[in-house]
Amino acid sequence: MTNTRKTHPLVKIINHSFIDLPAPSNISTWWNFGSLLGLCLVIQILTGLFLAMHYTSDTLTAFSSVTHICRDVNYGWLIRYMHANGASMFFICLFLHVGRGMYYGSYTYFETWNIGVILLFAVMATAFMGYVLPWGQMSFWGATVITNLLSAIPYIGTTLVEWIWGGFSVDKATLTRFFAFHFVLPFIITALVMVHLLFLHETGSNNPSGLISDSDKIPFHPYYTIKDILGVLLLILILMTLVLFSPDLLGDPDNYTPANPLSTPPHIKPEWYFLFAYAILRSIPNKLGGVLALVLSILILMLFPLLHLSKQRSMMFRPLSQCMFWILVADLFTLTWIGGQPVEYPYIIIGQLASILYFAIILLILPTISLIENKLLKW
């Protein structure tokens, strides 16, 4: 008798991806974040769908429609805060997932890695446009400041910005198109995730040692399905604790004031997960230079496969590289802190030093240390 799970055209795909998938026997909890990101995406799409049923993308009613969702819609407050804090959980998982890839050398699967970087850009774009939708003060001014950066592009800059705005300032046309894009992008992200998995399953998963694990594989189910369920429960626990006890912990109080083009908030800053990039942007006194640094701060991830000069794939047996990696992590925390501070002494200089260090570690220090470690192997 044939097993439907292995022969049915549709079920067969699921079987090869999540049930009979050969997985390394030693992958740690750091490999849980892929499935958690999948869960985050599902949560965001579902809560977003229900929010879209009650939201109106008009400058006159957007703010009130969000208030209406929180006050009058059944469990609307829960859906709204799950969506807002779900974005934070999404980015926490993303940063940990990327960090895991950097530490264990997963970027040597460069198709999977590059699709992942494109996914990171897509999620950041989606989150930015979603933040504009409630049409509070920070929504409006955040949209104005960030879209205005494109005017730094030589020759076509101003025209491009006005084309994105759909007028001469951030207004009704901008809000409507941001809503349209915010709705459609998660589905594009879902398609990209499938491509990401397709490329991953061509090679199989990496593992903490960075060594080929073909001789020691175990089936994904039940071993890693059970392990993933633990991660899922912990993620839901953290998310629901945040949503039910302090839903506004990570938000900005300014966004509870309706958008007013005539009054600028004292400190314009994005959500916490963009602060590191915002700090890099602000650390360069030139507009175009800042924009380039902002884009490069994420785009630099695509260079990782080229900058890998070590004879070992993972950092597991490379103490000098490990040390530098954790300095990079500390540097990113510093940048995140600086991004939320006002532009004044000493924050300006700290931000500039942290930005220089960020690029120096990735482009110069880590590759150099890799070469030193290669030499040490021969001793």
Swiss-Prot record:
Protein name: Cytochrome b
Keywords attached to this entry: Electron transport, Heme, Iron, Membrane, Metal-binding, Mitochondrion, Mitochondrion inner membrane, Respiratory chain, Transmembrane, Transmembrane helix, Transport, Ubiquinone
Binding site for heme b b566: H97, H196
Disulfide bridges in this chain: none
Subunit structure: The cytochrome bc1 complex contains 11 subunits: 3 respiratory subunits (MT-CYB, CYC1 and UQCRFS1), 2 core proteins (UQCRC1 and UQCRC2) and 6 low-molecular weight proteins (UQCRH/QCR6, UQCRB/QCR7, UQCRQ/QCR8, UQCR10/QCR9, UQCR11/QCR10 and a cleavage product of UQCRFS1). This cytochrome bc1 complex then forms a dimer.
Annotated localization: Mitochondrion inner membrane
Cellular component annotations (GO), alphabetically ordered: mitochondrial inner membrane; respiratory chain complex III
GO molecular function: metal ion binding; ubiquinol-cytochrome-c reductase activity
InterPro entries named in the record: Cyt_b/b6_C, Cyt_b/b6_C_sf, Cyt_b/b6_N, Cytb/b6-like_sf, Cytochrome_b, Cytochrome_b_C_euk/bac, Cytochrome_b_N_euk/bac, Di-haem_cyt_TM
Cofactor binding comment, as recorded: Binds 2 heme b groups non-covalently.
Bilayer-spanning residue ranges: 33-53, 77-98, 113-133, 178-198, 226-246, 288-308, 320-340, 347-367
Residues annotated to bind heme b b562: H83, H182
Record keyword ATP-binding present: no
Primary role: Component of the ubiquinol-cytochrome c reductase complex (complex III or cytochrome b-c1 complex) that is part of the mitochondrial respiratory chain. The b-c1 complex mediates electron transfer from ubiquinol to cytochrome c. Contributes to the generation of a proton gradient across the mitochondrial membrane that is then used for ATP synthesis.
Organism per entry: Marmota flaviventris (Yellow-bellied marmot)
Major localization listed first in the record, in broad terms: mitochondrion
GO biological process: mitochondrial electron transport, ubiquinol to cytochrome c
Additional remarks: Heme 1 (or BL or b562) is low-potential and absorbs at about 562 nm, and heme 2 (or BH or b566) is high-potential and absorbs at about 566 nm.
